């Protein structure tokens, strides 16, 4: 299985859970909600026969079939499902390091590319000040409408960050973008960094 690894311990644990469902042919379905965003969540659910989606990738395992959601497959690359025993019994863990990483290229829609650079280049720097910026919209004239949050909302340096950091980076990476506009209410200063 190239996209995801299910350890023997996880397989045995899941097989035991599935056997208790009294449903012949039941398997699991692995998917990511909101893949490629900061809100991505990796999920495993029971999958009764007929509940799999036509475009799912079926992976036959020793005791059951795992169905991988087609949209989620690129985000499941290098994912690991494991089961570790502890004093309380044990815990199934899912580690999907690429779940929140947007998958974009130069042919991707402009909003996906903007979000990609915001998440991978801009927000990691803003996080050191407890802040973040998000895309609200791309208006017809090629302007990205952004909103600051956290420590950036109300910060006295937001204009400098917007023009010297964010706009410069986005214009270098996305040639058809014409500029950025801030719609943040900066009168709210209780969490401002500066």
Curated annotation (Swiss-Prot):
Subunit structure and binding partners: Homodimer.
For this protein, the record's InterPro entries field holds:
Fe/S_biogenesis_protein_NfuA (IPR017726), FeS_biogenesis (IPR000361), FSCA_dom_sf (IPR034904), HesB-like_dom_sf (IPR035903), NIF_FeS_clus_asmbl_NifU_C (IPR001075)
Q: What does this protein do?
A: Involved in iron-sulfur cluster biogenesis. Binds a 4Fe-4S cluster, can transfer this cluster to apoproteins, and thereby intervenes in the maturation of Fe/S proteins. Could also act as a scaffold/chaperone for damaged Fe/S proteins.
Query: Known SUPFAM superfamilies for this protein?
Result: Fe-S cluster assembly (FSCA) domain-like, HesB-like domain
Organism, as annotated? Pseudomonas putida (strain GB-1)
GO BP term (any one): iron-sulfur cluster assembly
Q: How is the cofactor bound?
A: Binds 1 [4Fe-4S] cluster per subunit. The cluster is presumably bound at the interface of two monomers.
Q: Under what name is this protein listed?
A: Fe/S biogenesis protein NfuA
């Amino acid at each position: 299985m190239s996209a995801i690894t299910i350890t023997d311990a996880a397989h045995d644990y899941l097989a035991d859970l599935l056997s208790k469902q009294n449903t012949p042919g039941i398997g699991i379905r692995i998917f990511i909600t909101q893949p490629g965003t900061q809100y991505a969540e990796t999920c495993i659910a029971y999958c009764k026969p007929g509940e799999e989606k036509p475009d799912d990738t079926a992976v036959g395992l020793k005791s059951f079939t795992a169905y991988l959601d087609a949209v989620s497959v690129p985000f499941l690359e290098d994912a690991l499902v494991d089961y570790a025993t502890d004093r309380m019994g044990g815990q199934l863990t899912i580690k999907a390091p690429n779940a929140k990483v947007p998958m974009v290229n130069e042919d991707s829609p402009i909003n996906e590319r903007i979000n990609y650079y915001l998440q991978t280049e801009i927000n990691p720097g803003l996080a050191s000040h407890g802040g973040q910026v998000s895309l609200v919209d791309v208006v017809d004239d090629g302007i990205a409408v952004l909103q600051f949050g956290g420590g950036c909302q109300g910060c006295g340096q937001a204009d400098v960050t917007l023009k010297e950091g964010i706009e410069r980076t986005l214009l270098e990476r996305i040639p058809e973008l014409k500029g950025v506009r801030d719609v943040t209410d900066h009168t709210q200063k209780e969490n401002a960094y500066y």
